[in-house]
Amino acid sequence: MILIIDNYDSFTYNLAQCVGELGYDVLVCRNDEIDIPTIKQLNPNKIIISPGPGKPSDSGISLDVISSFSDSIPILGVCLGHQSIGYLNGGRIIKVSEIMHGKTSKIYHNNEDLFKTLPNPFIATRYHSLIIDNLNFPSSLAITAWTENNIIMACRHKDNQMLRGIQFHPESLWTFYGQQLLRNFLEYS
């Protein structure tokens, strides 16, 4: 079962639908309607931290989920979930110079892990006003994808490689290869 922590975002159920279309059972729980003991009892195979409004400190249980399970359960943070990973690892979350709401960008990547079967670059849709600052990027994380302007689009923990984040939205219709990226996370983590 794949657990999706919903940070009160309208895209969460699109994300759940994409995961379901790949043949996985999905459970969606709001970030203030579940606790760590319940998640332990559910024993999910993977966890996805959804997009959402606000900043990582507004993401309910999401930060605790990352802290509690990133060494035992593969976790993918999407948008706010990605920023939460950066924040927990000491990164600074800053406003992006151009707000990206429904805009597409070319995403360049390291051809590994989540991206190993994707073209380089590929087109992805972005919906965000915050990013992980690349000038003060945490040494515990590796940048795995970026834009042509060097805005961080994905990261992975260097030691705990089950923890990954992506800034863009794989569930968007305008993100080419988004479902393949999700498949890579679900099948190869």
UniProtKB/Swiss-Prot annotation:
Localization in the cell: Plastid, Chloroplast
Domain of life the protein comes from: Eukaryota
Lineage: Eukaryota, Rhodophyta, Bangiophyceae, Bangiales, Bangiaceae
GO cellular component, one term: chloroplast
Gene Ontology biological process terms in this record: L-tryptophan biosynthetic process
PROSITE patterns: GATASE_TYPE_1
Record EC number: 4.1.3.27
Keywords: Amino-acid biosynthesis, Aromatic amino acid biosynthesis, Chloroplast, Glutamine amidotransferase, Lyase, Plastid, Tryptophan biosynthesis
Disulfide bonds listed in the record: none
Official protein name in the record: Anthranilate synthase component 2
Chain ranges of the Glutamine amidotransferase type-1 domain: 1-189
Pfam families: GATase
Keyword check for NADP: no
Self-association and partners: Tetramer of two components I and two components II.
NCBIfam families: trpG_papA
Residues the entry annotates as binding L-glutamine: 52-54, 83, 129-130
